[in-house]
């Protein structure tokens, strides 16, 4: 039944989220999308308007507000709280046309079988909505396809369906969806929807593009030369694998390209079987043209290609096509992929049963999708370009090589690539692996010498494919090469697939946990050590043969071995590739999972060391190459340097007096003499120019989120971020911006933004800036060794109140932050309230003398001198047990007027304000008097420990440090 009729005739609109809406008036379910249902003035379905510009301009904010208020009233039970009268909440419902439901992410209850899963985000969409959704949510997927599919190489007919505009569609059979699930929603149509990312558009590579479309002779050779992975036989990709039973029939449509990502539903496949209706297609984005290639059934390679993927007669275990379009791997790997391969083969087997068969197939697709979803995690080929190049190279070699490709063609059968792209691929591809034909294949091709490391190296290189050890750089094999001739037919295909050394990893692009990663690195290193000696010996022999070193080297930057080289690969390069583990592997390591910190540590180590350990980038090859290479090696050195970057040596740019002196010196120099050295003078203390660039660009200013690109594409995994941040903090200079040392609340978000200084708050009654409750504690970092814990301890500990820790904050004996403020400013005189336990007899005069002496000291000694003096005599004075230590000694200044006069006092006041502005701990600063008297028992001595040093401090009375000392605490 058409999708529109799914609407319950009783007039209830589709319940969304399980809430039933009342319907005002009864819409009759519209039987064709064209008919005028009350859904808007003209009753156009949104679908028919597709692609038109929206004329009307909404004030989005207004709309959103309305929505919000509506939602609130609805959630509160629908009553308007303002008007308490009996306003019944009337819900007016506008019926959606079924064609439009997809746009709102709804799916009619009965239509659940018509849903397409978006593999990037696992959302459910009807097909119309799916196109819309892809265009909006995953545009990257969209572009990834359309730019790569090769539109219409030889002017072959563009499939008529792809161009249908919405109006034509509606003439063809109502709107697109109403024309009965049998055709629109048939399994075959869905095949283009199968993965949200790329469906199975087989790439046409430039080498083959010209020849492939119509002529049978050239296409057979095309199957040989192209690598089976990317485009070999589009039969394995195009209409997905068809079982051997239906081979003759489906052959004509086998090499059809799906174009565009899922949304364009192009079905030229079932025209003959369907007869009555062409399946309708959504108008695809105009860029993409579907290429329908009808290959004559006589092509030699086609049958082989089919049997390759459905080798057993049982169609249900044929491998799904492996789409090769590159989209971001993260987007593809997540969701459930629904691949219609099975359904299609079922349907094609029994033409006469087809309508029924298809209905059944589409209704039960969820079960099948479950089966398929694991097999079909689409393999993302992130090295597409490499493949294109190698294929081009292949083509060239077939022209220039001593032997042309035709000689190989007859006896070669393509090896199936097991699809290892899933986590537990072994269990899933078991049926395929156990398939007898495949086993025979393997047994025939397996060569034990591959496992024997003592074998000649050249032998191993030839057997790239079966080597346990993946990362050898590919080389093109020559047919005349006596040693390797026998293996050639078997391994040629693999040699192409291995173009990028890590091809095999790339098929298992799933996340690697730390242990595996370590193992992998370890294995690779082992392999290297075993094989290095052999490689070196061979290298010496082959070096004599090599004249065109430079050309080969130049090519190998792009990893295309040059046309004329002997069958040999530069060992240097092999080692490099040995160690490069695909960025995409690293990309996928779970990024915000607190449990995985251990993995992160391993990873961080790997990032810094593994890549660089065994690779000697700077080995001198020979004089000739050196010139060409200089630029390349420089780049390598630079990369190395950045990786081993020593943060401890970082100097942040500062404008202190020191720098000013430097500036003067630089200015006095005649500017022209040494342009190298004459950078901006303030950078003079940076180690290298690169370093200074790092300082200025990355590390100065408010620390913005930082990601260092280790390989050029890698987001930092957590562990690294944390260490970077730690290093930055310790190297930051005092004059740089604030940093909160509160550390990883956010599990190592890199460069978490420090709190900016608190915004000016409303002034207190006395005209001073008040506390800002929001602002946190900040610390001005000096040098890494100075930000030692004692500083932190000092700032973190609460300032404890009088005898009992402070009564109500209002009571005169308790020093609140505000009160301290007033005292410092001289706004309020301090009340001398001798507390009960004091013996204040001779205490006060001593106190004053003490202060005077300190004033003298302040004038005579330099800061460091005083510090030395304070630290010299360590007099361990235990505090009375009950007394918590008072860690912020303040100068008890009885003549307030004097305190106002000298500036250090002002400065101290500012510093204190900064510290005290933290409202989280309610600090009570006890009355100075109190404090000095509590400690009267201890003999005052100028040498006693400065109070901020540890627990041996004696609060207050003895050496009340002057303001300059206090500043040390805060600066």
UniProtKB/Swiss-Prot annotation:
Transmembrane segments: none
Assembly and binders: Component of the Spt-Ada-Gcn5 acetyltransferase (SAGA) complex consisting of wda/Taf5L, Saf6, Taf9, Taf10b, Taf12, Ada1, Spt3, Spt7, Spt20, Sf3b3, Sf3b5, Nipped-A/Tra1, a histone acetyltransferase (HAT) module made up of Gcn5, Ada2b (Isoform B), Ada3 and Sgf29, and a deubiquitinase (DUB) module made up of not/nonstop, Sgf11 and e(y)2 tethered to SAGA by Atxn7. Untethered DUB module (DUBm) composed of not/nonstop, Sgf11 and e(y)2 remains enzymatically active.
Superkingdom field: Eukaryota
Any single Gene Ontology cellular-component annotation: polytene chromosome
Keyword set, alphabetical order: Chromosome, Nucleus, Transcription, Transcription regulation
Annotated localization: Nucleus; Chromosome
Keyword Transcription regulation: yes
GO process annotations (BP): SAGA complex assembly
Main localization category: nucleus
Species annotation: Drosophila melanogaster
Entry protein name: Ataxin-7
Miscellaneous information on this protein: Shares sequence similarity with the 3 sequence blocks that define the Ataxin-7 signature in other species, however the order of the 2nd and 3rd blocks is reversed in drosophila.
Similarity field: Belongs to the ataxin-7 family.
Description of the deletion phenotype: RNAi-mediated knockdown results in lesions throughout neural and retinal tissues due to tissue degradation. RNAi-mediated knockdown in the retina and the lamina results in degeneration of these tissues and a rough eye phenotype.
Function: Component of the transcription regulatory complex SAGA, a multiprotein complex that activates transcription by remodeling chromatin and mediating histone acetylation and deubiquitination. Acts as a tether connecting the not/nonstop-containing deubiquitinase (DUB) module to the rest of the SAGA complex; regulates DUB module specificity. Important for regulating deubiquitination of histone 2B by SAGA. The SAGA complex predominantly acetylates histone H3. Important regulator of transcription during embryogenesis; required for nuclear anchoring and cellularization.
């Amino acid at each position: 039944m058409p999708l529109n009729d799914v609407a319950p005739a009783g007039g209830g609109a589709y319940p969304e989220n399980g809430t039933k809406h009342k319907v005002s008036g009864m819409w009759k379910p519209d039987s064709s999308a064209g008919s005028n249902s009350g859904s808007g003035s003209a009753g156009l379905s949104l679908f028919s308007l597709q692609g038109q510009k929206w004329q009307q301009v909404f004030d989005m904010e207004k709309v959103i507000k309305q929505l919000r208020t509506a939602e609130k009233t609805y959630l509160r039970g629908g009553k308007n709280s303002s008007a308490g009268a009996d306003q019944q909440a009337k819900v007016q419902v506008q019926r959606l046309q079924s064609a439009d439901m997809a746009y709102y992410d709804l799916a009619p209850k009965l239509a659940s079988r018509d849903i397409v899963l978006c593999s990037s985000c696992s959302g459910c969409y009807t097909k119309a909505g799916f196109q819309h959704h892809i265009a909006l949510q995953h545009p990257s997927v969209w572009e990834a396809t359309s730019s790569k599919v090769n539109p219409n190489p030889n002017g072959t007919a563009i499939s008529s369906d792809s161009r249908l505009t919405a109006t034509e569609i509606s003439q063809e059979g109502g709107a697109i969806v109403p024309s009965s699930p049998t055709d629109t929603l048939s399994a075959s149509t869905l095949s283009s929807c199968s993965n949200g990312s790329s469906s199975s558009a087989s790439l046409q590579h430039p080498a083959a593009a010209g020849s492939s479309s119509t002529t049978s002779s050239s296409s057979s050779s095309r199957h040989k030369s192209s690598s089976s992975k990317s485009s070999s036989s589009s039969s394995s990709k195009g209409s997905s694998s068809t079982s051997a039973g239906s081979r003759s029939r489906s052959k004509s449509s086998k090499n059809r390209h799906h174009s565009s990502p899922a949304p364009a539903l192009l079905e030229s496949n079932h025209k003959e079987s369907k007869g009555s209706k062409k399946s309708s297609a959504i108008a695809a984005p105009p860029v993409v043209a579907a290429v329908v290639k009808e290959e004559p059934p006589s092509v030699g390679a086609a049958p082989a290609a089919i049997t390759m993927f459905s080798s057993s007669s049982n169609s249900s275990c044929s491998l799904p096509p492996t789409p090769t379009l590159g989209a971001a791997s993260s987007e593809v790997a997540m969701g459930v992929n629904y691949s219609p391969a099975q359904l299609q083969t079922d349907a094609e087997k029994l033409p006469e049963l087809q309508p029924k068969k298809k209905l059944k197939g589409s209704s039960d697709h969820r079960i099948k999708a479950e089966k398929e979803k694991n097999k079909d995690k689409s393999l993302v080929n992130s090295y597409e370009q490499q493949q294109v190049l190698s294929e081009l190279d292949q083509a060239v070699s077939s022209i220039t090589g001593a032997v042309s490709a035709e000689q190989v063609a007859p006896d070669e059968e393509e090896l199936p690539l097991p699809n290892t792209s899933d986590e537990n691929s072994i269990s899933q591809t078991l049926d395929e692996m156990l398939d007898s034909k495949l086993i025979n294949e393997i047994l025939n091709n397996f060569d034990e010498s591959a496992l024997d490391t003592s074998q000649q190296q050249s032998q191993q290189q030839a057997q790239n494919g079966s080597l346990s050890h993946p990362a050898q750089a590919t080389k093109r094999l020559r047919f005349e090469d006596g040693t390797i001739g026998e293996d050639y037919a078997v391994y040629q295909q693999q040699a192409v697939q291995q173009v990028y050394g890590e091809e095999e990893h790339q098929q298992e692009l799933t996340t690697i946990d730390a242990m595996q990663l370590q193992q992998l690195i370890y294995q690779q290193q082992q392999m290297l050590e075993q094989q290095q000696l052999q490689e070196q010996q061979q290298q010496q022999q082959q070096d004599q043969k090599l004249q065109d070193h430079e050309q080969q080297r130049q090519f190998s930057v792009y990893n295309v071995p040059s046309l004329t080289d002997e069958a040999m690969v530069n060992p240097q390069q092999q080692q490099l590739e040995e160690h490069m583990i695909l960025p995409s592997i690293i990309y996928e390591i779970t990024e915000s999972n607190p449990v995985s910190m251990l993995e992160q540590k391993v990873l961080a180590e790997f990032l810094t060391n593994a890549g660089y350990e065994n690779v000697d980038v700077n080995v001198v090859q020979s004089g000739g190459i050196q010139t060409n290479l200089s630029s390349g090696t420089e780049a390598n050195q630079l990369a190395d340097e950045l990786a081993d970057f020593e943060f401890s040596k970082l100097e942040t740019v500062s404008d202190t007096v020191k720098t000013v002196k430097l500036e003067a010196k630089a200015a006095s120099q005649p500017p022209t003499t040494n342009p190298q050295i004459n950078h901006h003078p303030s950078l003079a203390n940076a180690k290298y120019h690169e370093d200074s660039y790092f300082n200025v660009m990355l590390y100065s200013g408010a620390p913005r989120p930082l990601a260092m690109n280790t390989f050029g594409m890698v987001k930092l995994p957590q562990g690294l971020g944390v260490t970077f941040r730690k290093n930055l903090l310790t190297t930051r200079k005092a004059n740089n911006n604030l940093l909160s040392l509160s550390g990883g609340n956010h599990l190592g978000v890199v460069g978490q933004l420090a709190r900016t200084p608190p915004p000016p708050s409303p002034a207190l009654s006395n005209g001073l800036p008040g506390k800002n409750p929001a602002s946190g504690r900040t610390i001005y970092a000096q040098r890494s060794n100075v930000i030692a814990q004692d500083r932190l301890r000092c700032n973190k500990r609460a300032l404890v109140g009088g005898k009992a820790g402070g009564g109500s904050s209002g009571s005169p004996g308790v020093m609140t932050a505000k009160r301290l403020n007033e005292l410092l400013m001289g706004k309020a005189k301090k009340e001398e309230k001798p507390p009960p336990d004091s013996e204040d007899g001779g205490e006060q005069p001593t106190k004053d003398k003490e202060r005077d002496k300190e004033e003298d000291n302040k004038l005579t000694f330099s800061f460091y001198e005083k510090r030395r003096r304070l630290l010299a005599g360590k007099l361990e004075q235990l505090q009375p047990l009950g007394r918590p230590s008072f860690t912020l000694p303040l100068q008890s200044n009885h003549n307030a007027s004097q305190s106002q006069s000298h500036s250090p006092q002002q400065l101290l006041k500012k510093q204190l304000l900064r510290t005290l502005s933290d409202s989280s701990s309610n600090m009570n600063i006890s009355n100075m008097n109190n404090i000095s008297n509590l400690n009267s028992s201890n003999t005052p001595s100028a040498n006693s420990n400065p109070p901020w040093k540890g627990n041996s401090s004696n609060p207050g009375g003895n050496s009340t440090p002057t303001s300059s000392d206090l500043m040390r605490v805060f600066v």
